[in-house]
Design a protein with these regions (language model features):
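Asp-based phosphoryl-transfer active-site loop
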Residues: 1-14, 41
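Short loop/turn segments at strand-loop or loop-helix junctions that form parts
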Residues: 2-7, 70-73, 115-116, 121-123, ...
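Conserved Rossmann-like nucleotide-cofactor binding loop
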Residues: 7, 47, 192
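Short glycine-/acidic-enriched loop or helix-start segments at secondary-structure transitions
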Residues: 11-12, 50-53, 196-197, 221
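Active-site phosphate-binding/coordination module
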Residues: 19-114
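A short acidic, often aromatic-flanked loop/helix-cap motif at beta-alpha or helix-coil junctions
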Residues: 73-76, 118-119, 158-162, 217-218, ...
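Conserved acidic, metal-coordinating active-site core of Asp-based
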Residues: 105, 112-187, 191-207
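Mg2+-dependent phosphoryl-transfer enzymes with acidic/Ser/Thr/Gly-rich catalytic loops
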Residues: 168-253
Length: 253
């Protein structure tokens, strides 16, 4: 299982330009072509944003991959089936009100539209502006966390007010779907991936949780690797070791 932004691809202020690190598509394509590994991306983005970025054009990866979007609230299967958790009308109205307020507040930063969340990004802003945006966003979001089903999700250079979901639920579902004893790995970089690491660690089996980022930080992940060399090396090793066995890999973003 793999996260996308910050794990498979470097962060970009313009998220539409966040393409995988050099060589990553090619090694994922070889893993996919072996027919022995299920590749799953688990991202905070809407699921349909991931496949075009990951596969490239023309596609390097022959087939679609399974994508869990919105931190696990959305699932896009390889055959095109799509499931998304519904938000109650009352909660949706509140999120719409907050989103509309932010659009007219001139805070700076960037508002990301998600059906189940309001997201404020300040990546690329100066430290002074970033602190200002974060403070104002917290002042707006934190009182609303008390509402039923809403939670505040912190990540690098952003805050997300969302319906209560995290990547751990997606990881639990994926692991629960594969035969006992199947090797599973989750690779992620951000604070939003900690729930996924914790879920992997709770399951008994030959599983790995890996923090993939330039510098180490406190984490529940079992291992730390530095991208992009650590990422490419891990994926190549996975292909070499498990190329002839039926295995499952899941990915986050």
């Amino acid at each position: 299982m793999l996260d996308y932004d910050g794990t498979l691809a470097p962060f970009r202020v313009d998220r539409s330009k966040a393409r995988p690190y050099t060589g990553v598509r090619e090694v994922l394509a070889r893993i996919q072509e072996s027919g022995r590994t299920r590749i799953v991306v688990i991202s905070g983005r809407p699921a349909r944003e991931i496949s075009p970025l990951l596969r490239g054009f023309p596609p390097v990866l022959r087939d679609p991959v399974e994508v869990w979007g919105l931190h696990g609230a959305e699932r896009l299967y390889t055959d095109g089936r799509h499931e998304v958790e519904q938000v109650s009308p009352a909660t949706q109205r509140k999120l719409d009100e907050v989103r509309e307020y932010l659009r007219h507040s001139n805070l700076g930063g960037e508002i990301e539209d998600k059906p189940n969340a309001v997201v404020m990004h300040w990546r690329g802003a100066s430290p002074r502006i970033a602190r200002f945006i974060e403070q104002r966003a917290r002042e707006l979001f934190e009182p609303l966390v008390k509402l039923d089903g809403l939670m505040l999700l912190e990540f690098e250079s952003g805050l997300e007010l969302r319906v209560g979901r995290d990547k751990g639920g997606a990881v639990d579902t994926v692991i629960g779907e594969v035969p006992q004893g199947t090797p599973v790995a989750f690779l992620g970089d951000d604070l939003t991936d900690e729930a996924a690491f914790a879920s992997v660690n709770r399951w008994s089996g030959p599983h790995l949780s890996i923090l993939m980022r330039a510098e180490p930080r406190p984490t529940s992940a079992m291992l730390w690797m530095r991208p992009p060399s650590g990422l490419r090396g891990f994926l190549k090793r996975w292909k070499k070791v498990f190329g002839g066995k039926a295995v499952r890999v899941a990915s986050a973003a």
